[in-house]
Amino acid sequence: MRKYIKIGVAGPVGAGKTALIERLTREIASKYSVAVITNDIYTQEDAEFLTKNSLLPPERIMGVETGGCPHTAIREDASMNLEAVDEMVARFPEVELIFIESGGDNLSATFSPDLADVTIFVIDVAQGEKIPRKGGPGISRSDLLVINKTDLAPFVGADLSVMERDARRMRNGQPFIFTNLMKNENLDGVIGWIEKYALLKNIEDPASLVR
């Protein structure tokens, strides 16, 4: 019986996918056995960032160079990522959580169900308050939607209440959460969601979770 959970993390370039994983691993690596797989088209930049900035040892971080469309590597042909998962499990048989970060993508990115057990989709306020209502599979069908960079709302003219209203409508009862990862605001809510819905801990919904 498989003992680990694979969490797919997707979202547009610059929304905060790598930052979210870096902050999460800093907080939970002492409690759970964690590994990370990143996807970049031609480089291993995200893997290198995590190696330098997260608390995980380098051998728990693996970069996959997709060499093409980042969507294909997580959906139509996930073989490279599945091989990376197998290698991580071989290295660390006790691993409990494997984060799989997609390459930079748009609102249509989805993970193959063979690759991710649950999915987190990250967007950010800097893209404008209209982003939630644009919809797309990531916004409407991910298991958790993270709306990051709330601190930038006043500078880009974004109304967080409008974003919340639109996210509620597009998500149809699925949870979402507002974060400011620069200050770790509501990071505990993301961790609580992972513990409750990915690791199936018997705990209450985080107070910062919105439905």
From Swiss-Prot:
Keyword GTP-binding (UniProt): yes
Keywords on record: Chaperone, Cytoplasm, GTP-binding, Nickel insertion, Nucleotide-binding
Cystine bridges: none
GO biological process: urea catabolic process
InterPro entries attached to this UniProt entry: CobW/HypB/UreG_nucleotide-bd, P-loop_NTPase, UreG
Pfam families membership: cobW
Annotated compartments: Cytoplasm
GO CC aspect terms: cytoplasm
Alphabetical list of SUPFAM superfamilies matching this protein: P-loop containing nucleoside triphosphate hydrolases (SSF52540)
Residues that bind GTP: 11-18
Described function: Facilitates the functional incorporation of the urease nickel metallocenter. This process requires GTP hydrolysis, probably effectuated by UreG.
Subunit structure: Homodimer. UreD, UreF and UreG form a complex that acts as a GTP-hydrolysis-dependent molecular chaperone, activating the urease apoprotein by helping to assemble the nickel containing metallocenter of UreC. The UreE protein probably delivers the nickel.
NCBIfam families: ureG
Family as reported in the entry's similarity comment: Belongs to the SIMIBI class G3E GTPase family. UreG subfamily.
HAMAP family: UreG
Protein's recorded name: Urease accessory protein UreG
Native source species: Actinobacillus pleuropneumoniae
Organism classification: Bacteria, Pseudomonadati, Pseudomonadota, Gammaproteobacteria, Pasteurellales
